[in-house]
Swiss-Prot record:
Lineage, highest ranks first: Bacteria, Pseudomonadati, Chlorobiota, Chlorobiia, Chlorobiales
InterPro entries noted in UniProt: Bacillithiol_biosynth_BshC, CC_BshC, Rossmann-like_BshC
Protein name: Putative cysteine ligase BshC
Bridged cysteine pairs (disulfide): none
Pfam families listed in its UniProt record: CC_BshC, Rossmann-like_BshC
GO MF annotations, alphabetized: ligase activity
Keywords: Ligase
Entry's family note: Belongs to the BshC family.
EC annotation from Swiss-Prot or TrEMBL: 6.-.-.-
Length: 563
C-alpha cells in the first residue's frame, strides 16, 4: 500500500473542506500558539502541558467505582471482548485516564470518520502509555445516543457499480424529537439490511459480514445498541471500550453539571458569546449558538424538549409551556437527573466532569466549536482536556490509481509523481481534469498527418519528370495516384479523430468515476462512504493498515492510502 500526505491547507476541492480555524489549530506555528493560548487550556503539541494535565487529573476526585461498574455493564451488553472488560478495572486507580472520542450512532457504523476517530483514540492512548508507563490510558468511544436526528443516524452510503447509493431506515413508531437510543429499528431494518448487503459484491469476506450484520441488526434493537455491537465486533482486537451517555446511571453521575446549569443560567450562554466574539475578531467563523438553558428535558416518551427561560426565575418546557420556578426545576433535576440531556455545548462539559479525560479526539468541525468553550469549562470549575485532531484518510482503489497513471501519460508528465498529481486533484480537481482532457485530445496528430502527406506528395511529384521521359502515360498514372493518396490520408484523419474522441470520452468517464470515489457527492470520502464497502473488498486487515498509518504519521496531514 502506497501512502501520500497532503497538507490540510492545500485541500480545497470538496465543497465542504476544512475551516481556517482547523487548519491553523492542526499546524505548528504562530497561529496555532495564539489559538491554544486564548481558547484552550492545554496545547497537544507541547510536551510540558502533558505533565500539567496529568497533575490536574490526578488531583481531582471522580466517582470511579460507579463509573467502572457502569462501563462494565454497558460493554457486556455491547459484546466488548472479555480482555477489554478487564481493562476497565484499571479505571478504579487515580492513575488511569481516558482518551475519548465519540459520535452519534450511524447505520451500519455510518461514515468512515467514526472508524478513523476510534482508531485515533486507540493510537493516542498507546502513545501516552509509552510516554508515561506509570499511568494507564483507556481509549473510549462515547456513543451519542441522546441525539434526536434520526434521519442522519439512519442513513449511510455505499459504492455500487461505480455509483454512490444511499441506504436509509424509515422510522418505526417514532415520535418527533425522540432520542435515537430509545427508538427500536422495527421490521423495516430487515429490508434495509437486505438492500445494503445486496450492494456488497461477492468476495471472501461477504458471507461473514452479512452474517454478523444480520445477527446484530434486528427489529427489536435500537440504532445505538446495534452501532455499539458492530463497533465492538470491528474493534475486538483493539482495547476500545464504549459508553452510552443516555444511561440513567450515567445521568446520576452528571447531575452536578445539569444542576449548576439550571442554577446559574443564562451564564453559560454569556461565556460562549464572549469566546465567540474573540474568535470572530481573529477572523474565524463560529458554529455554535448558545441558548439561555443548554439542556433538554426528556419526557416520558423519550422526546428531547427545549427548556426556555422566560424570566429570571421562570422556566417553561416547549411545547407544553407549563411554567416552573427555578426552585421547582432544580428539584426536578435533583430527583430525576435522567430527565435532562445536555446540548452540544454542555455535552463535553458533562463528559469531562464524569470521566478523567486526558484527551478528546475531535473532527475538524468539533475543534472549531470546542474553541468556543474555554470559559464555559471554567464556569463549571473544569479545564479542557487535550483536543487532538482525528486521523483523516482518502482511500484510493486500484481502478482510481490506474486512472491517475493514465492522466500522467495524457498530460505528458511521466516524470511527475502521483503525489504531485494527488496534490493537484485535492487542490483543484477541475485543473487536473482540464489538463488530462487536453492531453487526450492530442492535436499533434493533425500536424503529424499533414507533414506525412506533404512529404509523400512531394516525393512522388519529384518522380514526374523522370517518369515522363520514360513514358508520357506514366505522368497520368502518377497524377491519379496522388489523388488517391489524398483520399487515403483524409480517411486516416477521420478515423484518427474518431479514435481521439473515443479516448477523450473514455478518459472523461474514468475521471468522473475517480472523482466520485475520492470526493463522493463533492464531499470528503470519509464523510460519506461506509466502512463495509472496503471491508468486503479488502478484508478485515484494512483496519490494521489504518492503524499502522496513524502510528507512523502526525495529525497535521491528510493521508492518501492506495489500496
Amino acid at each position: 500500500m502506497n501512502t501520500f500526505l497532503i497538507d490540510y491547507r492545500d485541500i480545497q476541492t470538496p465543497k465542504k473542506g476544512f475551516s481556517g480555524l482547523f487548519n491553523d489549530y492542526s499546524h505548528e506555528g504562530q497561529m496555532h500558539d495564539k489559538l491554544t493560548e486564548k481558547f484552550f487550556h492545554f496545547d497537544y503539541l507541547k510536551e510540558a502541558d502533558y505533565y500539567k494535565h496529568l497533575n490536574t487529573l490526578v488531583s481531582r476526585s471522580f466517582r470511579r467505582k460507579e463509573l467502572a461498574e457502569l462501563l462494565i455493564r454497558q460493554n457486556r451488553r455491547f459484546g466488548t471482548a472479555a480482555k477489554h472488560l478487564e481493562s476497565i478495572e484499571k479505571a478504579l486507580s487515580p492513575r488511569c485516564m481516558f482518551v475519548i472520542t465519540g459520535q452519534q450512532p450511524g447505520l451500519f457504523t455510518g461514515p468512515l470518520y467514526s472508524i478513523y476517530k476510534a482508531l485515533t483514540a486507540v493510537i493516542v492512548a498507546e502513545r501516552q502509555k509509552a510516554m508515561f508507563p506509570e499511568y494507564d490510558f483507556i481509549p473510549l468511544f462515547w456513543i451519542e445516543g441522546e441525539d434526536h436526528d434520526f434521519e442522519e443516524s439512519a442513513t449511510t452510503s455505499i459504492i455500487d457499480a461505480g455509483q454512490i447509493q444511499q441506504v436509509s431506515l424509515d422510522p418505526w413508531k417514532r415520535l418527533p424529537g425522540q432520542m435515537v437510543s430509545r427508538s427500536a429499528m422495527g421490521p423495516g431494518i430487515t429490508d434495509t439490511l437486505s438492500d445494503f448487503t445486496s450492494m456488497l459484491q461477492e468476495s471472501d469476506y461477504r458471507e461473514q459480514i452479512v452474517s454478523m450484520l444480520q445477527e446484530i441488526y434486528t427489529p427489536d434493537s435500537s440504532l445505538e445498541l446495534a452501532f455499539g455491537k458492530t463497533m465492538a465486533h470491528l474493534f475486538k482486537d483493539y482495547p476500545l471500550i464504549f459508553l452510552s451517555a443516555s444511561d440513567p446511571d450515567f445521568k446520576n453521575l452528571a447531575k452536578e453539571i445539569y444542576y449548576r446549569e439550571l442554577a446559574t443560567c443564562p451564564h453559560t450562554s454569556h461565556t460562549i458569546i464572549e469566546q465567540s466574539s474573540l474568535l470572530e475578531n481573529m477572523g474565524y467563523q463560529t458554529q455554535v449558538k448558545p441558548r439561555a438553558v443548554n439542556l433538554f428535558y426528556v419526557n416520558h416518551h423519550d422526546q428531547r424538549m427545549k427548556i426556555e427561560q422566560s424570566s429570571a426565575d421562570s422556566f417553561s418546557i416547549v411545547p407544553d409551556r407549563h411554567r416552573y420556578s427555578r426552585h421547582q426545576i432544580l428539584e426536578m433535576c435533583d430527583d430525576h437527573p435522567e430527565r435532562f440531556s445536555p446540548n452540544v455545548i454542555l455535552r463535553p462539559v458533562v463528559q469531562d466532569h464524569v470521566l478523567p479525560t486526558f484527551a478528546y479526539i475531535a473532527g475538524p468541525g468539533e475543534i472549531s466549536y470546542m474553541a468556543q468553550y474555554r470559559k464555559t469549562y471554567e464556569h463549571f470549575g473544569l479545564k479542557m482536556p487535550f483536543i487532538i485532531p482525528r486521523g483523516s484518510f482518502t482511500l484510493i482503489e486500484p481502478a482510481v490509481r490506474r486512472t491517475m497513471d493514465k492522466v500522467l501519460q495524457k498530460t505528458g508528465r511521466l516524470t511527475q509523481s502521483r503525489k504531485q498529481l494527488y496534490h493537484t486533484a485535492f487542490h483543484d480537481l477541475r485543473i487536473l481534469q482540464k489538463k488530462a482532457i487536453s492531453g487526450a485530445e492530442n492535436h499533434d496528430f493533425d500536424t503529424l498527418l499533414d507533414r506525412t502527406e506533404k512529404n509523400i506528395l512531394a516525393e512522388l511529384e519529384a518522380l514526374s519528370p523522370t517518369l515522363g521521359k520514360l513514358d508520357p502515360n506514366l505522368e497520368q498514372v502518377l497524377a491519379g495516384s496522388l489523388v488517391q493518396i489524398e483520399k487515403v490520408m483524409t480517411g486516416i484523419r477521420q478515423k484518427t479523430h474518431r479514435a481521439g474522441r473515443r479516448k477523450h470520452d473514455e478518459l472523461v468517464a474514468q475521471l468522473d468515476k475517480a472523482a466520485a470515489g475520492i470526493f463522493p457527492e463533492d464531499l470528503p470520502q470519509e464523510r460519506v462512504i461506509n466502512i463495509f464497502y472496503y471491508l468486503n473488498k479488502y478484508g478485515w486487515g484494512i483496519l490494521d493498515a489504518f492503524a499502522t498509518m496513524l502510528r507512523a504519521h502526525s495529525s497535521e496531514s491528510h493521508i492518501i492510502l492506495e489500496l
